[in-house]
Amino acid sequence: MPGDSPVVSKRAAPKPRRAAMPGDSPVVSKPPDGAGPGDKAGGLGKAAAQMAAAPAAGKKLPRLPKCARCRNHGYSSPLKGHKRFCMWRDCQCKKCSLIAERQRVMAAQVALRRQQAQEEELGISHPVPLPSAPEPVVKKSSSSSSCLLQDSSSPAHSTSTVAAAAASAPPEGRMLIQDIPSIPSRGHLESTSDLVVDSTYYSSFYQPSLYPYYNNLYNYSQYQMAVATESSSSETGGTFVGSAMKNSLRSLPATYMSSQSGKQWQMKGMENRHAMSSQYRMCSYYPPTSYLGQGVGSPTCVTQILASEDTPSYSESKARVFSPPSSQDSGLGCLSSSESTKGDLECEPHQEPGAFAVSPVLEGE
């Protein structure tokens, strides 16, 4: 009512406290029943603190990160959605510089962990580190070919990457591919760009054979090798041919003197024929010549034709038949069917491709 006087709230007078005795337990005082507007704000803060402390004991609340730059300058700002509007995002003070450095380090660590995880998925567990100091690298393959990479003395270029790929090399002789980066900011530039590759490296792509007449694709030569005679041969022609062939075959390697079964090729008597399989009849890149070289596999059949009318003595036939050529190899001479001797050139295929027999034909008996 307008006539009523305003009601003044009365506060309860506090009771006098007695002095605490040593044996008494601490007593928690209760808040007063009535509270003013100032006390109401304090009561709300205490209630909020009690409500926050109650679930903290049972369940941990999610973490609410705050802006570190604002904290350095005395402000507490939640980090969510605050980065674009932070007043100290471009601050260059000492504390904010430490924050920026820590962020760069953490970003580098995250990128490194991601790269390691990708390498483990791909199966690359331990990457090969590059050598610190450039040194000559020599890698030898099983085909006795080497690749020598040497550093030149003139620092002409600054950056270069060298990748040597041996695609045509055998799988046993693999070559290590190394990338050699160079840093432009070095004081003393090490010239890793000018690399000299040894000429022996290219020998792995095409290796010439050890013997000059060993050039066919399947390692079959185009010339035919003279063969040794059997020591137990009783014919006069076989013995004569064997002695001359033994003298001329001293320089031949022992590998081509024996067949797969380990027996020597033999020139036998009248009953044996010269046998040759069809797989050895290959065309040659060179025209047929009148002398014999190393290896077997020529499509021509070698027979020695000794006619009694044309050979008055063995010395003349020896000088005429086994006349060494003048230019290339100390091979044996060969009599072809176009010469003036009388005889038959007989070639019959046999079942055994590894056995070759040359039969002399004696006429006039």
Swiss-Prot record:
Claim: Metal-binding is one of the keywords in the record: yes
Parts of the chain that traverse the membrane: none
GO BP term (any one): cell differentiation
DNA-binding feature ranges: 63-109
Chain intervals with Basic and acidic residues compositional bias: 341-351
Primary location group: nucleus
Biased composition (Polar residues): 324-340
Domain of life assignment: Eukaryota
Disulfide topology: none
Assigned keywords, A-Z: Activator, Developmental protein, Differentiation, DNA-binding, Metal-binding, Nucleus, Repressor, Sexual differentiation, Transcription, Transcription regulation, Zinc
Additional record remark: Knockdown of DMRT1 in early embryos results in the feminization of male gonads, affecting tissue organization, gene expression and germ cell distribution. These experiments are in support of the Z dosage hypothesis for avian sex determination or at least, for gonadal sex development: according to this theory ZZ males would have a higher dosage of DMRT1 which would initiate testicular differentiation and expression of the key conserved Sertoli cell differentiation factor, SOX9.
Name of the featured protein: Doublesex- and mab-3-related transcription factor 1
UniProt organism field: Gallus gallus
